[in-house]
Amino acid sequence: MLLRFRTANVRSLRDEQELTFVVPEDDPGTSARLVRLAGDQSLAVLPLIGIFGANASGKSNVLAAMTDMRAAVINSYARWAAFDGTARIPFALNDKDGQQSASFFEVDLVLDGVRWTYGFELGTDRVEAEWLHSYPRGHRQVWLDRDASRAKVYDWPGNRVKDRAGLERRTRPNALLLSTAGTDNHPQLTPLFHWFRRNLWLINPEDEREQREAFTTRELTGSRARRINELLRVADLGITGAEVVQEGTGPATVKLTHRSAAGDVAFDWTQESFGTRSWFALLGPLLLALDEGAVLLVDELDASLHPRFAAEVVRLFHDPQANPQGAQLVFTSHDPSVLGTPSGGRLLEPGQVWLTEKDEEGATDLYPLTAASPGEGEDLMKSYLAGAFGAVPSLLEGQIARRLLAANERERECEAERSGS
């Protein structure tokens, strides 16, 4: 289970930003779950966070930074060998000194009842630092302390890690040691490596949608078929079921059956709407995350789903019976309707709502709604749209039309000047 994510100098996130799922135990709200830790300790942890903000404010970059960290752990040992340096994306608007600064990533997570902190810093050419701490009885144990600026790059306090010399020897300067250990199936570090493989999956409206459609299609022949069909039917799309069609040696395709006056009719996949295909493509990864207790990242949850669909996805992660493994969801959205219910209640608690804004230098600031101290009965959607919490476009009514008319007028004036010369 993910507790916190921190990052700096990554994409539009110039300064250090933190996204936290942990809430005070004395005020956990109705959504937080109590996570038991070794040493008779516990933490109240949220199953879901929504990130809201104006266009180009950096919402998507928060999720992208999380997947950048995942990719570095999974790929740096096996795939970065062909690079002269590291595959990082620093803040692009930095001055020259800022461009050379390291990119920082860190997570706190719970694995088998033990809290772990793992992080690293990537420079242009090499891994500048890497660290791993555990808290088996509430007290920190340092497993790894890597610092490329020292004469002795690796330090192993307590000598807890096996095959230390081998790990040092096999880890290139531009690769993470955890990536080396996981790829080589190290007995102690592989579980943490596998956490990154099984978590922080990113879904956005377009990228890899065909792969997700193919994945859900394969799931229709497995143990999740009944639930996929049920979620297709309950979505009120007129769908009565799905069938997998295998023609020759090509990849399997899916046909969704629809109600008609003459009975069920199977539609070719190309005839399905964008919204239907988006819902179908989401179901495979969604059910896998719920079954595995994984962290799922969904960019622009509202982009291709009706607000009621988006609300039902949120409710799935909130419901302990539907989500018994403690899966977590981080999503971005432009649509504030997901903040509340039609009856005026709150679908998300203030602690689950995070906002993004860009400053004058193009850097994203990520902050929780709780920083604005909303009232206990305050309508979060109305207050957000009114700009009470920030993170909304700074547009006046009719401003776009006025700017367009002014630009058209200037264009006509320039054309007249060219014609007269």
Give the predicted meaning of each segment.
Residues 29-41, 150-176, 283-287, 380-400:
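Short, surface-exposed secondary-structure junctions/capping segments
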Residues 115-244:
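Electropositive, glycine-dotted interaction segments
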Residues 1-41, 47-70, 260-383, 391-392:
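Switch/communication elements of ASCE P-loop NTPase nucleotide-binding domains
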Residues 369-421:
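Acidic, Mg2+-coordinating catalytic modules of nucleic-acid enzymes
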Residues 8, 207-271, 399, 404-421:
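Extended helical coiled-coil dimerization/tether regions that scaffold
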Residues 91-153, 157, 356, 366-384:
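P-loop NTPase motor core
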Residues 36, 42-50, 54, 63-124:
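Conserved P-loop NTP-binding catalytic core
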Residues 62-101, 171-230, 319-328, 334-337, ...:
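An exposure/low-complexity boundary signal
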